[in-house]
């Protein structure tokens, strides 16, 4: 039986035991453009450089001609059938930089706790998983692609990673003893690194109502890896009173239904009921649902777990999540006994805020305009009143009979000489001792000079 046949058989066995399979997505293959610094594979005749201090296993599936190659101190190149390297002169391809080597990207950048790097075998249209459950849970079967090279960081080690089984390099590990031997080998050290611990245990989820994921302790590292491309901060939800379900890193818009279940409840059957009976209706188009068992937040009741149903709106229509949540509550009221549901409650986010940033900007501009108009209307009377008060204070501050002169540095007029009061401009001729008539006026600043003239 080939590798693909073994994988398909294993997935069928997982379906019979209600185990969820998680597939590792990224790889460290030579022929993948995303693994190189310039987002393209090395050009023909170009130089190739691997970081000297990084351990890495690289699968090469094609033939390549290079002019120079710098290999890591501890690593391996796995050559597929027909693959190899040949020496060539420096290439002159237009897309290649002049003499710049193609550098293999850091192989330690992939983390086990990053939800972006996993794909679930239970993916279906309209179905999603909360962030903590996108990473392998303790009852999941983990598959690393048999036809690709990979390298995984196991995290800081504060929370050991435990899953049901691990399939890698054509082997399936279900016992800690076998996995420990593999991790200590050179092949294991090239593919798994970091202080974190990895263990397996054949713990089947035999409960039809489902099992808790078990990633609560690792959720801080899961959220940190998820939000790293966003600077470590959650994007603002586009609704009022946003919700944050258990296992989710950021707030979302929609609704959450919590079910108190009995022994007859079947998680897979109920998830299929939502997908087939409700999400197929036109009024619920664009909604996505996540159904899982979570620890009960309030321990006032006997049951320590409950079923969490998360409804998220991704389309332009709003209010669909709330309508579906109320429909699920009505379905429980009518068919709860047959479904094994004892009680149901719901929470719903508030109204959507479409274009909230633009609305906030427009509101700020409008407030600034109103404030400016108010200043223009109120300021002139206040300024006029303040001017009169200042003028009166200025007049009162000058005592009667005080000298009004000042020293003028240009004309050197002493301040002790009181300047005459200015006279009204007069163009009436003034008679002189002789018969000559002159038209003039007295300039108080030059009164002394004119008198001498």
Swiss-Prot record:
User: Hey, what tissues is this thing expressed in?
Assistant: Detected in proximal tubules in the kidney cortex (at protein level). Long isoforms are highly expressed in small intestine, colon and kidney (renal proximal tubule epithelial cells). Shorter isoforms are detected at lower levels in testis, thymus and peripheral blood leukocytes.
Q: Which residues lie on this side of the membrane: Extracellular?
A: 20-357
Nucleus is among the record's keywords: no
Where in the sequence does glycosylation occur per the annotation? 35
Q: Where is the signal peptide?
A: 1-19
- Transmembrane stretches, by residue range? 358-378
Provide the VWFC domain boundaries. Answer: 202-254
Q: Which Pfam families match?
A: Amnionless
Residue pairs linked by disulfide bridges in the UniProt entry: 43-96, 137-213, 205-211, 223-249, 234-250, 239-253
> What ranges are annotated Cytoplasmic (topological domains)?
379-453
Q: Which GO terms describe its biological process?
A: cobalamin metabolic process; cobalamin transport; Golgi to plasma membrane protein transport; protein localization; receptor-mediated endocytosis; renal protein absorption
Q: Name one GO cellular component term.
A: receptor complex
Q: Where is this region: Interaction with CUBN?
A: 67-87
Q: Does the keyword Glycoprotein apply?
A: yes
Regarding how it is modified after translation, the entry says: N-glycosylated.
**Main function:** Membrane-bound component of the endocytic receptor formed by AMN and CUBN. Required for normal CUBN glycosylation and trafficking to the cell surface. The complex formed by AMN and CUBN is required for efficient absorption of vitamin B12. Required for normal CUBN-mediated protein transport in the kidney.
Q: Which disease relates to this protein according to its record?
A: Imerslund-Grasbeck syndrome 2: A form of Imerslund-Grasbeck syndrome, a rare autosomal recessive disorder characterized by vitamin B12 deficiency commonly resulting in megaloblastic anemia, which is responsive to parenteral vitamin B12 therapy and appears in infancy or early childhood. Clinical manifestations include failure to thrive, infections and neurological damage. Mild proteinuria, with no signs of kidney disease, is present in about half of the patients.
Q: What is known of its domains?
A: The complex formed by AMN and CUBN is composed of a 400 Angstrom long stem and a globular crown region. The stem region is probably formed by AMN and the CUBN N-terminal region, including the EGF-like domains. The crown is probably formed by the CUBN CUB domains.
Q: What else is known?
A: The role of Amn in embryonic development seems to be species specific. In mice, null mutations lead to embryonic lethality. Human mutations give rise to much milder symptoms.
Subunit info here reads: Interacts (via extracellular region) with CUBN/cubilin, giving rise to a huge complex containing one AMN chain and three CUBN chains.
Q: Which protein, by its recorded name, is this?
A: Protein amnionless
State the organism of origin. Homo sapiens (Human)
């Amino acid at each position: 039986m080939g590798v693909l046949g073994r994988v398909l058989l294993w997935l069928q066995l997982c379906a019979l035991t209600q185990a969820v399979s998680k597939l590792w997505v990224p790889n460290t293959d030579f022929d993948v453009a995303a693994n190189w610094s310039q987002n393209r594979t090395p050009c023909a005749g170009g130089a190739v450089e691997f970081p000297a201090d990084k351990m890495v296993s690289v699968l090469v599936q094609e033939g390549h001609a290079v002019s120079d190659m710098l290999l890591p101190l501890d690593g391996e190149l796995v050559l597929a059938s027909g693959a190899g390297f040949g020496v060539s002169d420096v290439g002159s391809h237009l897309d290649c930089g002049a003499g710049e080597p193609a550098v293999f990207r850091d192989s330690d950048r992939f983390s086990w706790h990053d939800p972006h790097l996993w794909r679930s075998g239970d993916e279906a249209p309209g179905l999603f998983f909360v962030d903590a459950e996108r990473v392998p849970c303790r009852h999941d079967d983990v598959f690393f692609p048999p036809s690709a090279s990979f390298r995984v960081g196991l995290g800081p080690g504060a929370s050991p990673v435990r899953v049901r089984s691990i399939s890698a390099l054509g082997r399936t590990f279900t016992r800690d003893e076998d996995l420990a031997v593999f991790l200590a080998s050179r092949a294991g050290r090239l593919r798994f690194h970091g202080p974190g611990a990895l263990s397996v245990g054949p713990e089947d989820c035999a409960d039809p109502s489902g099992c808790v994921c078990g990633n609560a302790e690792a959720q801080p590292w899961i959220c940190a890896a998820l939000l790293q491309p966003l600077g470590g901060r959650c994007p603002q939800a586009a609704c009022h009173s946003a919700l944050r379900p258990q296992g989710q890193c950021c707030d979302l818009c929609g609704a959450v239904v919590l079910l108190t279940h009995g022994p007859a409840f079947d998680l897979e059957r109920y998830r299929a009921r939502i997908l087939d009976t409700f999400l197929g209706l036109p009024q619920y188009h664009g909604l996505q649902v996540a159904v899982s068992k979570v620890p009960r937040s309030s321990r006032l009741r006997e049951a320590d777990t409950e079923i969490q149903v998360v409804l998220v709106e991704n389309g332009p229509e709003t209010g669909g999540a709330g309508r579906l949540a109320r429909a699920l509550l009505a379905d429980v009221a009518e068919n709860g006994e047959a479904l094994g549901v004892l009680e149901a409650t719901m929470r719903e986010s508030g109204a959507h805020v479409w274009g909230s940033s633009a609305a906030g900007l427009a509101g700020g501009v409008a407030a600034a305009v109103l404030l400016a108009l108010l200043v223009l209307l109120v300021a002139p009377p206040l300024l006029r009143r303040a001017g009169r008060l200042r003028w009166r204070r200025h007049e009162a501050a000058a005592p009667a009979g005080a000298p009004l002169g000042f020293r003028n540095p240009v004309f050197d007029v002493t301040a002790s000489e009181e300047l005459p009061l200015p006279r009204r401009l007069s163009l009436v001729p003034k008679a002189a001792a002789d018969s000559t008539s002159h038209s003039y006026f007295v300039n108080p600043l030059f009164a002394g000079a004119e008198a001498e003239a």
